[in-house]
Design a protein with these regions (language model features):
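Residues located in well-ordered beta-strands
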Residues: 104, 130-132, 195-197
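C-terminal boundary and immediately downstream tail of ABC-type ATPase nucleotide-binding domains
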Residues: 111-136, 171, 238
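Structural detector for hydrophobic anchor residues on beta-strands
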Residues: 128-129, 192, 217
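ABC ATPase nucleotide-binding domains
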Residues: 1-116, 120
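A short macromolecule-binding patch
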Residues: 150-151, 217-220
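Short, conserved beta-turn/loop elements at beta-strand boundaries and strand-helix junctions
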Residues: 137-139, 199-205
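Glycine/charge-rich catalytic "coupling/switch" loops of P-loop NTPases
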Residues: 141-195, 225-253
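Short, acidic/hydrophobic/Gly-rich beta-strand patch recurrent on exposed beta strands
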Residues: 141-145, 171, 207-212, 220
């Protein structure tokens, strides 16, 4: 018990009654009760769900420290993708009881297997738009609304070539949409027109909520962005980071 209390930094709480403990302290006591059993595997089922936002962040750090100290397996169940991404070394993404993808946090973010995983992992979530693929002068393009962007050659696989003339789902993460003039001028093949509906200054960055080809898009741009509500602006996609999915199966192409 003393060793578990030392690991969790709750030695000074051992003589207190439960009613005298804060929410975070009670969570650590609960983990201590598990630690003293010296288990080979810890199973945690949404242990942070009843905590406020500030305490939840603090307890995420505590659990990661505990995992590092004990060097044992933790199975952690959560509906919060932020908890999964920040705490997991390997994540199982499930939908309706069916496993969608098992991978590292980095691969789930950069190489999602389907639309569900792509939209679930990441905040703000990935933007999606239905587009038609075409081929002109040896290059493949995705067209949606009045916009047409070129797909980088590195992403044009034989499988993707099979979708020429068909509709697909194109996904792009908010941080891969840029409104600064230098980037736009360097990517003329990836420029789109967008209407600014809402802006949110987040401090180190700004979120732009855009109407683009009839779809709602979110862009995470530099805090120095001059875009204002009601503006029609040009944005450019970082096309080497786009994701393309089959429209019917929603699986990555």
């Amino acid at each position: 018990v003393t060793e578990a209390a030392k690991i969790l930094d709750i030695e000074h709480l051992l003589d207190r009654k439960p009613k005298a403990l804060s929410g975070g302290q009670r969570q650590r006591v609960a983990m201590g009760r598990a630690i003293v059993r010296n288990p080979k595997v810890f199973l945690m089922d949404e242990p942070l769900s009843n905590l406020d936002a500030k305490l939840r962040v603090a307890m995420r750090t505590e659990i990661k420290k505990l995992h590092n100290k004990l060097q044992t397996t933790f199975m952690y169940v959560t509906h919060d993708q932020t908890e999964a991404m920040t705490m997991g070394t390997r994540i199982v993404v499930m939908k309706d009881g069916v496993i969608q993808q098992v991978d590292t946090p980095a691969n789930l973010y950069t190489k999602p297997d389907n639309v569900f995983v792509a939209g679930f992992i990441g905040s703000p979530q990935m933007n999606f738009v239905t587009a038609t693929l075409s081929k002109e002068n040896g290059s493949v393009y995705a067209s949606f609304g009045d916009n047409k962007i070129m797909i980088p050659n590195g992403k044009v696989t034989p499988e993707l070539e099979g979708y020429i003339g068909k509709e697909v789902i194109v996904g792009i993460r908010p941080e891969d949409i840029h409104d600064d003039e230098a980037f736009i001028s360097s990517r003329p093949e990836a420029v789109c027109n967008a209407y600014v509906e809402v802006t949110e200054m987040m401090g180190a960055e700004t979120y732009l909520y855009l109407e683009l080809a009839g779809e709602q898009f979110t862009a995470r741009v530099n805090q120095r962005s001059t875009a204002k509500i009601g503006d029609t602006i040009k944005v450019a996609f970082e096309t080497n980071k786009i994701h393309i999915f089959d429209k019917d199966t929603e699986m990555a192409i």
